[in-house]
Regions:
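Membrane-cytosol interface segments of multi-pass membrane proteins
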Residues: 1-173
Length: 173
């Protein structure tokens, strides 16, 4: 696994160039740069999920397992930060019009999540794995899980609600 990490590192720095003397990158949080950084973390998230299903006991796997242990679920922190920053910039530029759209973002995300839950239910049905009705219904709200990991979706949905309520109060007053 450490070889995959080295390849990822090489790809990540391949196009990088240091700023010259007296130069400052004012676009460090623009969409192009943040997408590149998020790409690195997408791969780390995929590696992290892959480790749950494969055996990694070789000597070349230990550096990655140590890194994974230290990073934990923080590999998604960049997504939360950049999303929040992007939403704040959109609110700064578009104001109340954008704030009103946050609820539709909430419902779109929940709908997509529920489609994934349906897929899990179908696979579990095929595998003859059954869950109580209450647990299934709560899984559609992200309150419980039926084999899927939902903590990130729950966090994003809650942050959407907090942001919507906060800005509705701030912009109306």
């Amino acid at each position: 696994m450490v070889f995959f990490l080295l390849i990822l590192l090489a790809v990540a720095v391949a196009g990088a160039r240091p700023c010259g003397p007296g130069e400052f990158n004012t676009d460090y949080l623009d969409k192009k740069n943040t997408t590149a950084v998020n790409g690195i973390f997408v791969v780390l998230v995929l590696f992290s999920h892959y480790v749950q299903y494969a055996d990694f006991e070789g000597p070349f796997d230990m550096p990655y397992l140590t890194l994974r242990q230290h990073l934990g679920q923080m590999v998604v922190a960049t997504f939360l930060f950049y999303s929040g920053y992007g939403m704040m910039e959109a609110i700064r530029r578009k104001g109340d019009g954008y704030v009103r759209k946050i609820l539709s973002k909430f419902w779109q995300l929940l709908f997509r999540f529920d489609l994934a839950v349906l897929l899990y239910l179908a696979v579990n049905q095929i595998l003859d794995i059954h869950f109580p009705l209450r647990e299934v219904l709560l899984a559609f709200t992200t309150w419980t899980v039926i084999g899927n990991s939902n903590w990130y979706i729950t966090a994003v949905l809650i942050l959407y609600v907090i942001m919507y309520i906060s800005f509705r109060i701030c912009l109306s007053g």
